[in-house]
Amino acid sequence: MTYTMDYSKLKLFIYMRPLLILLLTTLTAVSLKAQVEPCGPVPTENQLRWQEMEMYAFIHYSLNTYTDQEWGFGNEDPQLFNPSSLDCRQWARVCKQAGMRGIIFTAKHHCGFCMWPSAYTEYSVKNSPWKNGKGDVVRELADACREEGLKFAVYLSPWDRNHPEYGRPAYVEYFRNQLRELLNNYGEIFEVWFDGANGGDGWYGGANETRRIDGKTYYGWAETFRMIRELQPHAVIWNDGGDRGDLRWVGTEAGNVGETNWSLMPSKGDTPWHMLHYGVEDGDMWCPGETNTSIRPGWFYHDTENEHVKSLSKLMDTYYKSVGRNSCLLLNFPIAPNGRIHPNDSLRGIAFKKMIDEVFKVNLAEKAKTQVKGNETVIDFGKPTTFNRFLAEEDIRYGQRVKRFKLEAMVDGKWVALKDQLVEKGNGLTTIGHRRIICFPTVSATKLRFTVLDAKREPLIKKLGVYLAPELTADIPDAGEKKSSNLHLFFSSPTQMMIDWDAEQTISSFRYLPPQDSKDGTVTHYTLWASTDWSNWTKLASGEFSNVVNNPIWQTIKFQPVRAKMLKFDADRIATGNRMAYGDVEVVTGNN
């Protein structure tokens, strides 16, 4: 049986059966629900609301901003927190203009410093010079979000490197008390975000030691979750350990999820990387992936990254590999020391939103004729039409169903297969879910054919779209630094790298890129030495590369400019394995 109609009339669903496609253009949602059986686990109302947000912002801001760190140790002085022009309304305006529909704020990061005047600790803004200790950043941001029509959410680090009781039962009650403050006092919260980094070295009230915990059992997640659902019944929970939350990490902070992305997970057991990145087709609970990344290399502000803001083409690539792969995008905007989003970040974020609008402003399928037969949908443009993007959406209220599909364009009277150009292997035409966007080289065709090849049950396709995205220019190289050339590297031991160059010169920083294909050998703690003669060595710096395992980006060690001809880079601690590894190293010369 064949139906031909104006695509503009196809507003609700294409209900596909293996041998027959029925166009449901007049059924109400109630009557549809009466006729369609769910397929496996389905989303809750909270998860549906979350999925429809599509993009929202992370805001990282704490004492780390003033110590040029990603992870504070827990002994940083609250007197450092004194921004000259903190403006949460500017944050909210920028995020809204960048297309974000909400903001998640780091109310407390691993250092333990609270960005609200918590009644349970002195380590907070109430003991900073900002507003004479009377300020509350969480309050100001929550109010600003509601003024701008944005949703508000909180990040609360379970790990606290400041608290003396961390690792002991007393800390869990402290943690819940602080969570209760945030959930009770700042209006409706759309998401509660618990970081997966838990346990390690820290100040811990002066003990200055390493404490290990079992992240799955220590915090008593079941009881914590019950409290959240009681105090904030509309919130979703993101949790990277212990009991499953409503959302899952996608296994990387690079800003992408798998081209195959099931919103399903097993409710029990460990979650290896492939489960996080691709989901689990036969999972017994609905747990969609949230894709988190930063507009800069790091999560917190560093002035050395002002010229390293993600390019527009990189942001669009991130969009296609997150929102366009059945996920939501959580995009971080770090706050600069003055208390505002840096202009480089705000301008790029706003340009990002404008580009998304430009790509999707005209759905070429709306003026075409659509013919549906069996498991095929043919969109007939009536004349050669240029396009390079395809969009499909399932009605996930009834489960995620499509496993594999095919796209073909009619070019010069012949069907030509299309593939997703953003995947390295295969054609990338697998799952759909809430939204799937396929990118391919620009083609001029008279027709487009969409064929479902495999599905768990009858697919419910609620939207199809065809678009022409403008071409983006190549990325502009980063500027502002001179990197030394002619470096000579060798290893004097499995944990010591020696670097020298042709002539003595002034150096001001050293950059280390972790291995990109494995965590083995990644340096997490280091000591750096300089010399002019191989005999007398001056210690330049020692410290920690925070979060380097999850976010293996360039790590910069800055120091006072010094004359040197060689460096010694010691791996004091390695993530896994017993031999240090690297992707690249750079020595920055001059007095930068």
Language-model features: locations:
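Exposed low-complexity, polar/acidic, P/S/T/G-rich flexible segments that act as propeptides
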Residues: E458-I476, I507, G577-N592
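Mature catalytic domains of secreted/periplasmic carbohydrate-active enzymes
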Residues: Q35-P441, T451-L460, Y467-E471, R511, ...
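Short beta-strand segments and strand-loop junctions that repeat across beta-rich extracellular domains
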Residues: R404-K414, R449, H525-S535, M566-K568
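Bacterial Sec-dependent N-terminal signal peptides
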Residues: M1-Q35
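Surface-exposed loop/edge segments in extracytoplasmic proteins
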Residues: G413-D420, A474, W534-S542
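Noncatalytic modules at the cell exterior or secretory-pathway interfaces
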Residues: P441-L453, Q560-D572
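Short beta-strands within extracellular/lumenal beta-sheet-rich domains
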Residues: V372-K383, F491-A503, W554
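Extended extracellular/luminal ectodomain segments enriched in beta-structured repeat modules
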Residues: K383-R389, A445-T446, D502-S509, R563-M566
